[in-house]
Design a protein with these regions (language model features):
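Two-component system phosphorelay core
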Residues: 1-118
Length: 118
């Protein structure tokens, strides 16, 4: 079963925020994640496997820091498996990444409120 072993951990912002300037870091994370999720949606609509692969690679490094990269690993395995992934499996994997992206954005905005308007 593809779901076995998947962890649904909440993103962890502690490493990101350890550099200081928390409000700015959270704003940047939110803005960049929103752009990346839009690019992912567009690549999926175009059935652009190369684009999906490039975005997956790009997102993995930042999401690993947040300990939120599990959906990206699922998508990566699908894109790099034998043959062409079926559309339903690909849609499911992309949805997992989009859902995690939405969670990162939501939690980053919640965390951002702790730091006021500065």
């Amino acid at each position: 079963c593809a779901m076995k072993g998947e962890r649904s951990e909440k993103p962890d912002f502690s490493s990101l925020l350890s550099y200081g300037n928390e409000a700015s870091m959270l704003d940047k994370l939110t803005t960049e994640t929103e752009k990346e999720m839009q690019a992912l949606r567009e690549a999926k609509c175009r059935n652009d496997a190369e684009g999906l692969n490039a975005l997956t690679h790009h997102l993995r490094s930042s999401w690993e820091i947040l300990r939120a990269d599990q959906p990206l690993r699922v998508l990566y395995r699908l894109l790099h498996g034998e043959g062409t992934p079926d559309n339903e499996a690909l849609s499911h994997a992309v949805k997992g990444v989009l859902d995690k992206g939405a969670e990162i954005i939501r939690l980053a905005k919640e965390e951002r409120r702790k730091y006021g308007h500065g």
